[in-house]
């Protein structure tokens, strides 16, 4: 429960007028009480009560006792902002190499071409020894990126992955849906999982086609045959072209919508990548680009009330941070004001959510840990390594893109009207220049990664799914491929931006 550190102070809260101002947005509600507090006790203490407090879409029936807006809350380590300054990301080259090998071990698992979500078969959520289409698409993209698209370095894994895709793409789905939107498959045989699950998962075809388009362009550049790769890309893209407005499950496989920001951004990005691949192999990419532009126009409205929201039934979500970092070049890029505003809202929410953040903020520790969404309860509802890493990457990308602007036009003074969100987020003084902003963005990325490293240090370099919100220890699925992918990718971007630093 958010505000655990102050929840036990209920009895000490002075009695307040019953007409207290209870018009408080969900993101700013601060728990007044403790689990099990009832309405009479809540209101007798001058706090606000809602019988149906919409913390998130999966807890609609849970009531909420919270402080009114006109009350001075107990001191909160999240109210004074964050320490966004560190001089390096914490992770050493040696540690990077260990994680790289652990990551590689999860690709082409058992020589099947599959990407195992994690080798752990005894997690709080059951076995992770499956190939998730989403995890695989994102992890393969990261694998190509961190290896600089070097054909010789990635050929073995990508040839195997391409073979896997061809095998599963035309399976008959016993669940009665198009197999292209099936969430996960058994390893090594590649059969659709038949247990109960949130279906369909509509970002899957886009993410798979994204990865295969990137691989296809590498093969083309190295004189290889791309015909079979084009077949799998065009087959997945055909689904996206016809069905991008259809209802599906969210990134976390819990709620449904036709309008998830993550899914929309995955469509836009993958359509543009497929268009590039089409052009390279003599196909027509115009339809892909036109559809990407159509989706982009329909997605502009997700910036509302000062931040980018994931969906109407799950507005505050770390998936948005992932979207900006991974797909943002086509809409609301990492260096944008919308990006900074969203970081501000999301980080405040997760500081309030996790006692470990409050404790470490109070101690002045740089950075922050973030998770899926406020009110999450899966496996303890903790910070996630893959999301914290992608927040670090988002800062790095913001700095990199700011440096590129400086390269094009020289250093320049920041105009408050054009940069107020970044100035506010990073506490930049009056008179700051673009170079000051870029340095601060990189330092903020280092702050996030440094805090993450403090919690994941392990002799074997194993990176898990979550970090316990009370103890700060790694928890849940062990050796999560997606965690390796995002941490390594963030550090890869950090290395690429290093050339700009004085």
Segments from the language model and where they lie:
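Low-complexity, Ser/Thr/Pro/Gly-enriched N-terminal "stalk/linker" regions
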Residues: 73-134, 160, 164, 168-184, ...
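Extracellular Cys-Trp
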Residues: 31-34, 41-67
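CBM-like carbohydrate-recognition segments
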Residues: 175, 179, 184-185, 376-387, ...
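Aromatic-rich carbohydrate-recognition surfaces in CAZymes
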Residues: 127-243, 264, 487
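Extended ligand-binding clefts on enzyme/binding-domain cores
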Residues: 94, 133, 166-199, 260-268, ...
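Secreted, propeptide-processed cysteine-rich mini-domains
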Residues: 18-41
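Cleavable N-terminal signal peptides of Sec/SRP-targeted secreted and luminal proteins
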Residues: 2-19
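Well-ordered alpha-helical scaffold segments within catalytic/enzyme domains
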Residues: 80-89, 137-152, 207-223, 266-282, ...
């Amino acid at each position: 429960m958010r505000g655990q550190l102050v929840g036990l102070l209920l009895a000490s809260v002075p009695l307040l007028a019953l007409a207290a101002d209870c018009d408080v947005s969900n993101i700013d509600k601060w728990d007044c009480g403790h689990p099990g507090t009832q309405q009479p006790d809540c209101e007798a203490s001058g706090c606000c009560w809602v019988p149906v407090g919409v913390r998130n879409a999966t807890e609609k029936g849970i009531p909420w006792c919270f402080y009114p807006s006109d009350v001075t809350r107990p001191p909160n380590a999240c109210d004074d902002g964050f320490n966004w300054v560190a001089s390096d990301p914490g992770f050493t080259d040696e540690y990077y190499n260990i994680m790289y090998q652990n990551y590689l071990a999860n690709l082409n698992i058992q020589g099947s071409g599959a990407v195992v979500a994690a080798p752990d078969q005894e997690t709080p959520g059951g076995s992770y020894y499956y190939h998730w289409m989403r995890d695989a698409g994102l992890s393969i993209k990261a694998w190509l990126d961190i290896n600089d698209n070097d054909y010789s370095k990635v050929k073995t894994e990508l040839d195997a992955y391409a073979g896997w895709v061809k095998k599963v793409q035309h399976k008959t789905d016993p669940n009665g849906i198009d197999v292209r939107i099936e969430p996960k498959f058994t390893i090594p045989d590649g059969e659709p999982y038949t247990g109960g699950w949130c279906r369909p998962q509509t970002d899957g075809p886009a993410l798979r086609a994204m990865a295969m388009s990137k691989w296809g362009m590498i093969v083309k550049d190295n004189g290889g045959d791309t015909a079979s790769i084009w077949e799998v890309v065009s087959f997945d893209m055909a689904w996206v072209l016809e069905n991008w407005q259809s209802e599906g499950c969210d990134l976390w496989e819990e709620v449904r919508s036709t309008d998830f920001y993550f899914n929309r951004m995955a469509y836009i990005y993958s359509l543009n990548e497929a268009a590039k691949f089409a052009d390279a192999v003599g196909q027509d990419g115009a339809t892909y680009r036109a559809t990407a532009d159509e989706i982009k126009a329909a997605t502009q409205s997700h910036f509302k009330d000062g931040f980018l929201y994931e969906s109407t039934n799950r507005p505050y979500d770390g998936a948005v941070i992932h979207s900006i970092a991974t797909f943002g070049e086509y809409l609301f890029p990492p260096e944008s004001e919308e990006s900074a505003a969203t970081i501000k809202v999301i980080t405040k929410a997760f500081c309030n959510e996790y006692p470990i953040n409050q404790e470490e903020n109070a101690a002045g520790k740089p950075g922050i840990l973030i998770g899926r969404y406020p009110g999450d309860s899966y496996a303890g509802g903790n910070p996630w390594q893959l999301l914290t890493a992608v927040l670090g990457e988002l800062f790095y990308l913001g700095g990199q893109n700011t440096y590129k602007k400086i390269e094009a036009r020289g250093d320049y003074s920041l105009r408050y009207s054009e940069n107020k969100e970044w100035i506010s987020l990073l506490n930049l003084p009056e008179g700051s220049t673009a170079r000051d902003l870029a340095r601060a963005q990189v330092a903020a990325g280092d702050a996030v990664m440094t805090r993450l490293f403090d919690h994941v240090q392990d002799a074997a370099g194993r990176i898990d799914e979550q970090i316990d919100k009370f103890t700060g220890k790694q928890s849940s699925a062990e050796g999560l491929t997606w965690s390796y992918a995002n941490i390594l990718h963030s550090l890869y971007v950090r290395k690429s931006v290093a050339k700009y630093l004085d």
